[in-house]
């Protein structure tokens, strides 16, 4: 079944509050605050369509760069093509010294679809109002997940577009411009296995390499910091997820309570029926606010933490690559010494050693800048999101408070 | 003196009129109205020993509140009888029977108090004067508190003792403030006695809190964890609500057993309330028998009011159960939210520690603190969710069960009347047969039996009318109480929600500048 199609204004009308969307927009983009409008190259996802198994993103580019045939154009891409682009960066030796923007997670509507299905099965066991209410809720949930996945894919592209080196990447330009299918079929089993071993080796290596204490204080500090930070962000992200989910469950309960109160109110013959109906209305309204609180916490806190979980992993990968190149450099040094000692293939050894040295120094230089940028981005993103989180929490609490006080005024006035 | 009193205006006995009377929430106005029931009406007299027919003055439409003659009896009792009075004993001695005796035809007619022959008219009048005096004073002035749960004893014989404190200006009590120590089975015993006296004549006796073998075992065994303290608190609150509801009932308040429960320092142990005792098992068997009977009795309902009301209560029951389930889910999720918020707070604190940007690190620590405080808030809110909202609902689910029980008793009463009529018919047939067969002594016997059963039929009819009237009044009172209860509690609950939001605003307002300070 075709899911909701996101219009150019990103579905301004479909949600209860248009501000929900724009905040989300701001939220995720704000994760990388320096991705401001840059006339040279602007990328966004202007539309998206959800089909049964896949999501089709419309990638829209505006650029004044001479590399492109037109100033403004769009193509349709799927998730696998984003992964292809990301992997091409990873595999490119030239980019070893950069933090590669983390790949967007795969769109996952399974849970939401399951819930919608269960609701359909249980239709007989609830009243029409309840069913409609729950259906609306689940549809809103589906929509929220959809918007999130769009935003995450967009952030990836924006990060690439904002990076001074990566934005010039040829594959990136092809991705943006080539209006045919890139035919990047997902990795087959063999390739997936290769990947798996590669990662294993990397982590084994990581153990070995990280044992080597770095001469450079900066990197030594970064390594200790990143290791610990990454773990703690992982934990915080998981706990934040659980917290927002509980919040949502409680909001769902308000829904059912509202329905029950409504039923009590309509069937009651005494003067308390008005009372019940008013309280039922209150629960319905307050539930919307509570659901919003949960959604905003999810966006500003959980998503922020999740994103920096991935970014800190990318930063760790950078450090790993630098360590690898350091090891290569040291090995090349040893080989050179051996060659000199034996006086055999010295030139070869010298060239090799020089290359390794250059590579290591190049990586170190760009890595340093990348890590400094990473910190700047991180601090800015946290600041923006924490401020917005606090502002939203306040807004919702005040809204809730007013609802409750208004209701109480009416109820007390009646009795 | 009594004769000079003007009876308060009464309507034609419809339930609504009774409600009007009670508007003043004056316990004693209702008593006063009942005191003025006409002595000529057949109903009350049959309940009481003959001397009480001195019921006062004033032609009164017979329908109203005549069943409260029993109230009169107790009104007198409160004035005259001390705890040691021999007159009390017949009532007290009946304490063992209610728990065990099933509702048989003989006990269907209320008076255990028949043996108690009270009321010289003078006493009667005097008590009415005093009652009227108090009626002009404070409204329904009695406050019950259940507090200070204390564990007594050790091991499996241990039990919790609760302090029951009464504050009152009612003159039926010897002091204005007093307290006693009671254990859970005492409460059950009280309910048992009240139920046996009043349920089958149509009074809605508030049900006692439920037993919990698991809960109590934990307490006995000495598990000092939060779940057993929660259990004790839940029970304490439930016992308090139970007593408050019971004393609110004008008829029950007059009951000497209730007074003894509140006042007397030593209470005979109610052993028959133990779940697995012989009496307990007998009760279960009787309940089952009742259930079967309910299914097989088909009553010709002549009064649509009863059918309507029964349906209403059925619907209410359903909806309340649903609502209760949703609120219980809310309590559960709120507790979960609290736990998860606490876990997140700790995690955020750790993250703040490892963050190497100073300002951000500080802000994250602040966030952790805010979340910790919010966790506390959630806990408190869950507490309110439960004790105000959820417990209100479960109380009313049980109350409605009691109401349904009372309706069932009416059906049984009708059945008894029917049966008497059928038997009378048979006896008449027997008499006719004997006449034909010309057996003089058998005829005499038959005539005697006919007389006996004629009386029983009359009694059956009176009982049925009585219980119907009582139920109408009780249901009216119940509905009023229900409306008041729900309104009061729900408003209190909403106020708890208001408080939570106000606190949230405070916490986030304090945090916002910290977040903005990240440079």
Curated annotation (Swiss-Prot), chain B:
GO terms for molecular function: phosphatidylinositol binding. It is a peripheral membrane protein. Residues 140-269 form the PX domain. Residues 278-295 are annotated as: Membrane-binding amphipathic helix. The keyword Ion transport does not apply. Disulfide bonds: none annotated. The keyword Iron does not apply. It is found in: Early endosome membrane; Cell projection, Lamellipodium. The modification N6-acetyllysine is found at residue 469. InterPro entries: AH/BAR_dom_sf, PX_dom, PX_dom_sf, SNX2_PX, Sorting_nexin_N, Vps5_C. SUPFAM superfamilies: BAR/IMD domain-like, PX domain. Residues 260-519 are annotated as: Interaction with RhoG. A 1,2-diacyl-sn-glycero-3-phospho-(1D-myo-inositol-3-phosphate) binds at residues 183, 185, 211, 235. The modification Phosphoserine is found at residues 97, 117, 119, 185, 277. Residues 299-519 form the BAR domain. One of its GO terms (biological process) is lamellipodium morphogenesis. PANTHER family: SORTING NEXIN, SORTING NEXIN-2. Belongs to the sorting nexin family. Involved in several stages of intracellular trafficking. Interacts with membranes containing phosphatidylinositol 3-phosphate (PtdIns(3P)) or phosphatidylinositol 3,5-bisphosphate (PtdIns(3,5)P2). Acts in part as component of the retromer membrane-deforming SNX-BAR subcomplex. The SNX-BAR retromer mediates retrograde transport of cargo proteins from endosomes to the trans-Golgi network (TGN) and is involved in endosome-to-plasma membrane transport for cargo protein recycling. The BAR domain is able to sense membrane curvature upon dimerization. Membrane remodeling seems to implicate insertion of a N-terminal amphipathic helix (AH) in the membrane. This is Sorting nexin-2. It comes from Bos taurus. The gene is SNX2.
């Amino acid at each position: 079944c075709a899911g909701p199609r996101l219009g150019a204004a990103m579905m301004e009308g479909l949600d209860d509050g248009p501000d929900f969307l724009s905040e989300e927009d701001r939220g995720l983009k704000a994760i990388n605050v320096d991705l401001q409008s840059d006339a040279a190259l602007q990328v966004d996802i202007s539309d998206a369509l959800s089909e049964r198994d896949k999501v089709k993103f419309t990638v829209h580019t505006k650029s004044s760069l001479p590399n492109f045939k037109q100033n403004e154009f769009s193509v349709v891409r799927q998730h696998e093509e984003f992964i292809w682009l990301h992997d091409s960066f990873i595999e490119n030796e030239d980019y070893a010294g950069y933090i590669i923007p983390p790949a967007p997670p795969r769109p996952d509507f399974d849970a939401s679809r399951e819930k919608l299905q269960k609701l359909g099965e249980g239709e007989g066991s609830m009243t029409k109002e309840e069913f409609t209410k729950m259906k609306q809720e689940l549809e809103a949930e589906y929509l929220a997940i959809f918007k999130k996945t769009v935003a995450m894919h967009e952030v990836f592209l924006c990060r690439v577009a904002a990076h001074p080196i990566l934005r010039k990447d040829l594959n990136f330009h092809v991705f943006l411009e080539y209006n045919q299918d890139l035919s990047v079929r997902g990795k087959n089993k063999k390739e997936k296995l290769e990947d798996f071993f590669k990662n294993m080796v990397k982590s084994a290596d990581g153990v070995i390499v990280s044992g080597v204490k770095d001469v450079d204080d900066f990197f030594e500090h970064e390594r200790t910091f990143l290791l610990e930070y990454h773990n703690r962000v992982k934990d915080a992200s998981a706990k934040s997820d659980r917290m927002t989910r509980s919040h949502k469950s409680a909001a769902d309960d308000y829904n059912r309570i509202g329905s029950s109160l409504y039923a009590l109110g309509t069937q009651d013959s005494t003067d308390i029926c008005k009372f019940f109906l008013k309280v039922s209305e209150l629960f319905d309204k307050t539930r919307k606010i509570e659901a919003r609180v949960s959604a905003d916490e999810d966006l500003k806190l959980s998503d922020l933490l999740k994103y920096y979980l991935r970014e800190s992993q990318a930063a760790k990968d950078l450090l790993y690559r630098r360590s690898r190149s350091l090891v290569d450099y040291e090995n090349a040094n040893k080989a050179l010494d051996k060659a000199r000692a034996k006086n055999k293939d010295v030139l070869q050894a010298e060239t090799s050693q020089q290359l390794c040295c250059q590579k290591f120094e190049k990586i170190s230089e760009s890595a340093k800048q990348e890590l400094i940028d990473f910190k700047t981005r991180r601090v800015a993103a946290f600041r923006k999101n924490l401020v917005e989180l606090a502002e939203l929490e306040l807004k919702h609490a005040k809204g809730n408070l007013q609802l409750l006080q208004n209701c109480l005024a009416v109820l007390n006035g009646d009795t | 003196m009594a004769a000079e009193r003007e009876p308060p205006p009464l309507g034609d006995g419809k339930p609504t009129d009774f409600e009007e009377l009670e508007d003043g929430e004056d316990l004693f106005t209702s008593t006063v109205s009942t005191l003025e029931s006409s002595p000529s009406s057949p109903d009350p007299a049959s309940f009481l020993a003959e001397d009480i027919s001195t019921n006062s003055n004033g032609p009164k439409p017979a329908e109203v509140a005549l069943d409260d003659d029993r109230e009169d009896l107790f009104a007198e009792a409160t004035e005259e009888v001390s705890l040691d009075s021999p007159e009390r004993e017949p009532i007290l001695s009946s304490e063992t029977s209610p728990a065990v005796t099933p509702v048989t035809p003989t006990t269907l007619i209320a008076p255990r108090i028949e043996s108690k022959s009270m009321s010289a008219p003078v006493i009667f009048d005097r008590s009415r004067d005093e009652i009227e005096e108090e009626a002009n004073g404070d409204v329904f002035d009695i406050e019950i508190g259940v507090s200070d749960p204390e564990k007594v004893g050790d091991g499996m014989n241990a039990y919790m003792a609760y302090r029951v404190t009464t504050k009152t200006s009612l003159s039926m009590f010897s002091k204005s403030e007093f307290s006693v120590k009671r254990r859970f089975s005492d409460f059950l015993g009280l309910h048992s006695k009240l139920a046996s006296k009043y349920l089958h004549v149509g009074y809605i006796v508030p049900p006692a809190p439920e037993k919990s073998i698991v809960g109590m075992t934990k307490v006995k065994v000495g598990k000092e964890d939060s779940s057993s303290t929660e259990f004790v608190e839940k029970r304490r609150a439930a016992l308090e609500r139970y007593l408050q509801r019971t004393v609110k009932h004008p008829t029950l308040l007059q009951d000497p057993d209730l007074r003894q429960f509140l006042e007397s320092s030593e209470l005979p142990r109610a052993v028959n309330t133990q779940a697995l005792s012989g009496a307990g098992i007998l009760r279960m068997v009787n309940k089952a028998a009742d259930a079967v009977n309910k299914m097989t009795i088909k009553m010709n309902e002549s009064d649509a009011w009863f059918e309507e009301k029964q349906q209403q209560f059925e619907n209410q029951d359903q909806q309340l159960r649903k609502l209760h389930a949703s609120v219980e889910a809310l309590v559960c999720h709120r507790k979960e939210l609290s736990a998860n918020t606490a876990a997140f707070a700790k995690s955020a604190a750790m993250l703040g520690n490892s963050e190497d940007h100073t300002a951000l690190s500080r802000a994250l620590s602040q966030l952790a603190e805010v979340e910790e405080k919010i966790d506390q808030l959630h806990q408190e809110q869950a507490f309110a969710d439960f004790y105000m909202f959820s417990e209100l609902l479960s109380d009313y689910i049980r109350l409605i069960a009691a109401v349904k029980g009372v309706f069932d008793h009416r059906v049984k009463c009708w059945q008894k009347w029917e049966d008497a009529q059928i038997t009378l018919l048979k006896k008449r047939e027997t008499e006719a047969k004997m006449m034909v067969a010309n057996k003089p002594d058998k005829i005499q016997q038959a005539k005697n039996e006919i007389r006996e059963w004629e009386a029983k039929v009359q009694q059956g009819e009176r009982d049925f009318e009585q219980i119907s009237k009582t139920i109408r009044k009780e249901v009216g009172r119940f509905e009023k109480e229900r409306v008041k209860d729900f309104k009061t509690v729900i408003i209190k609950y909403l106020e708890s929600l208001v408080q939570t939001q106000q606190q949230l605003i405070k916490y986030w307002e304090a945090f916002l500048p910290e977040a903005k300070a990240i440079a």
